[in-house]
A protein has these predicted regions:
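Conserved RNAP core-binding helix
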Residues: 31, 39, 50-67
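Helix-turn-helix DNA-binding motif, specifically the short coil turn and the N-cap/start of the second
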Residues: 49, 155, 164-169
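Structural recognition of an alpha-helix C-terminal capping motif at a helix-to-coil junction
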Residues: 55-62, 75-87
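Short, Lys/Arg-enriched C-terminal cap helix and immediately downstream tail that follows
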Residues: 94, 143, 178-187
């Protein structure tokens, strides 16, 4: 069966999930749709090099495929796959017995700087190396919400769904993440 990649833009995630359950070839459309954003999320969350990030992404897509039948269509599909991606990435980091490697794309730092009032206040003290160190010195719980909100541009509800935390907790964690980032930068 030939699948037209152009169909990818026309079909909703839920339609593609349903079609993938009936014909595994349609999973290619789902994986094509989410490959770039998930790869970027894994890299931002973990700090792994490109090759290791690709490996984690492949494992994530296998998990998504194997668990596709357990997806609840009442939930947002992107939240569901980001949750799987998040859990698997954190599990991989624990297996490696390491904290994330200090990798952040300089463009991400510019994006954070331009979207954070806290960072705008300390913009003159912020250079790229300092920002990398500051972000990776945060506890995982703060770094996770910061990456999802600022770099992945997720709404609070979607972050809550991905992290399986109440929306109030997400808001508190994000607020604390920016405060801690500010404290580190000011030092």
């Amino acid at each position: 069966m030939h699948i037209d990649i152009k169909d990818n833009k026309k079909l909703s995630d839920k339609d593609l999930v349903k079609m993938s359950l009936e014909n595994k070839d349609y999973f290619l459309l789902l994986s094509t749709r989410y490959e770039t954003p998930l790869l970027r999320y894994i890299k931002r969350l973990s700090g792994l090099n490109h090759e290791d990030t690709q490996d984690v992404l492949q494992e994530v897509f296998i998990k998504i495929y194997l668990n596709l039948s357990s997806y609840n269509p009442k939930l947002k599909f992107s939240s569901w796959i980001y949750r799987i991606t998040h859990n698997h990435t954190m599990s991989e980091l624990r297996k490696r017995h390491s904290r994330p490697i200090n990798y952040i794309d300089p463009q991400d730092l510019v994006f954070i700087k331009s979207n954070s009032d806290v960072l705008k206040e300390t913009d003159n003290k912020l250079d790229l190396e300092q920002a990398k160190k500051a972000i990776y010195s945060l506890k995982d719980k703060y770094k996770e919400v910061l990456v999802l909100r600022v770099l992945e541009e997720k709404e609070y509800q979607e972050i809550a769904d991905i992290l399986k935390k109440p929306i109030g907790t997400v808001s508190t964690l994000l607020n604390r993440a920016f405060k801690k980032l500010n404290e580190i930068i000011i030092k």
